[in-house]
Amino acid sequence: MYPVDLHMHTVASTHAYSTLSDYIAQAKQKGIKLFAITDHGPDMEDAPHHWHFINMRIWPRVVDGVGILRGIEANIKNVDGEIDCSGKMFDSLDLIIAGFHEPVFAPHDKATNTQAMIATIASGNVHIISHPGNPKYEIDVKAVAEAAAKHQVALEINNSSFLHSRKGSEDNCRAVAAAVRDAGGWVALGSDSHTAFSMGEFEECLKILDAVDFPPERILNVSPRRLLNFLESRGMAPIAEFADL
């Protein structure tokens, strides 16, 4: 069990079923020390309003010994790497994930998908690319992994991709993990929980990493401090309340 989960959704994304309090309770039971709530960006049909993300600044940092990161799973909007996160939203958020979602950016050819993903990586606005192994969006995996390593952006291995969504992701995710390994980049593990009961579940992710002998020192979820060091290296100010996690 890794003590950090970086991708989950609450009832604010109406196709998910748990509250912030539900996740805190599960984190305590499962030994999760730090997690990020990453509801969908506002361009998705059932996503929260942009004020939802701005108002995350009122959240407590730590509840019952569990640290809470304020995040978003933004949508890649176009080949220029624009995402549906801007202005005051950036000021309130600790963690910005971005990925392809069909209602916002339909699948294109390999070159177009790759251009959009690399532009997003190079924008400086995101920390993690979500489910880059989605088989509906063919990409140049090597080029994406090299860009991600260059710009200190992690590529996600998403546990839900092997269980509930994005069927047929296994081969692509092995290729992503191997390319990140070779490029010297970072991998982030995400449960992509839409109910609190699955938070912290990375069993399928770990099968992928084991298959390519991925170095554990390049996995962000190994400890809260590793993840926080990564975010601070990207410009996040140290969060005093997280010092003892």
Swiss-Prot record:
A Gene Ontology cellular-component term: cytosol
Residues that coordinate or bind Zn(2+) 3: 73, 101, 131
Gene: ycdX
Binding site for Zn(2+) 1: 7, 9, 73, 192
Entry cofactors: Zn(2+)
Stored InterPro entries: Phosphatase_YcdX_put (IPR023710), PHP_dom (IPR004013), PHP_phosphatase (IPR050243), Pol/His_phosphatase_N (IPR003141), Pol/histidinol_Pase-like (IPR016195)
UniProt: Zn(2+) 2 binding residues: 15, 40, 194
Biological processes, Gene Ontology terms: bacterial-type flagellum-dependent swarming motility
Record keywords, A-Z: Hydrolase, Metal-binding, Zinc
Assembly: Homotrimer.
Highest taxon, organism lineage: Bacteria
Co-factor: note: Binds 3 Zn(2+) ions per subunit.
Known EC number: 3.1.3.-
Gene Ontology terms, MF aspect: phosphatase activity; zinc ion binding
SMART domains the record matches: POLIIIAc
Record family assignment: Belongs to the PHP family.
Transmembrane segments: none
Protein name (Swiss-Prot/TrEMBL): Probable phosphatase YcdX
